[in-house]
Amino acid sequence: MAAAVSAKLVKELRDKTGAGMMDCKKALAATEGDANKAVEWLRQKGIASAEKKSGRTAAEGAIGSYIHTGARVGVLVEVNCETDFVARGDMFQSLLRDVSMQVAACPNVEYVTTDEIPNEIREREKAIEMGRDDLEGKPEQMKEKIVEGRIGKRLKELALMEQPFIKDSSITVADLVKQTAGKIGENVKVRRFTRYTLGEGIEVEENDFAAEVASMQNAG
């Protein structure tokens, strides 16, 4: 049994269905490592992938918002689905809230997916990594491989869909979206988001406290 439910099988099932890692492990354990039966098991549980639905147009949906405690961080998120009926449903609205909270909790995230990250940013990150002192003297091929791994990690840090879900770190936001799509039976897509932080971008003048006190004394 342990040999059948290998990490490789879990990864293959996860890639195929979009289900979370723990769900894939449970499915494979329940079906004695049979990948096809595991897919059916996930479908019966309502957590199979929306793979077949992903090509359909998601033009409906809703814009969600989240204001963090203290009103210092605010978020707007657009999530799309196929029908207005689904957009009004509890499951879709729950996803909308969760994604909004996720954006609020991830200040470094700037893009929905890694595919959206511009080439100039990729090239900039590569130039930075190639210049690291710890790579000095290493063979070029090895250096390229190390840099590629570091860049991949860095780009994932910038993408919302790659983040561990704040309520269940065993899955990513992408997994959450796929699971929700599988349950509601429609294509679901996070289209865009905006994160506002109070005072961001405002240059605050730093006063010289000692000079300020001295000037007050002189004025007195």
UniProtKB/Swiss-Prot annotation:
Q: Which InterPro entries match?
A: EF-Ts_dimer_sf, Transl_elong_EFTs/EF1B, Transl_elong_EFTs/EF1B_dimer, Transl_elong_Ts_CS, UBA-like_sf
One GO cellular-component annotation of the UniProt record comes to: cytoplasm
Keyword DNA-binding included in the entry's annotation: no
Q: What is its main location?
A: cytoplasm
Q: Name one GO molecular function term.
A: translation elongation factor activity
Give the signal peptide as a residue range, or say none if absent. none
Cellular localisation: Cytoplasm
- Keyword Electron transport attributed: no
Keyword entries, A-Z? Cytoplasm, Elongation factor, Protein biosynthesis
Q: Where is this region: Involved in Mg(2+) ion dislocation from EF-Tu?
A: 83-86
Similarity-based family: Belongs to the EF-Ts family.
Give a short account of what the protein does: Associates with the EF-Tu.GDP complex and induces the exchange of GDP to GTP. It remains bound to the aminoacyl-tRNA.EF-Tu.GTP complex up to the GTP hydrolysis stage on the ribosome.
- Report the protein name in the record: Elongation factor Ts
Q: Species name for this entry?
A: Synechococcus sp. (strain CC9605)
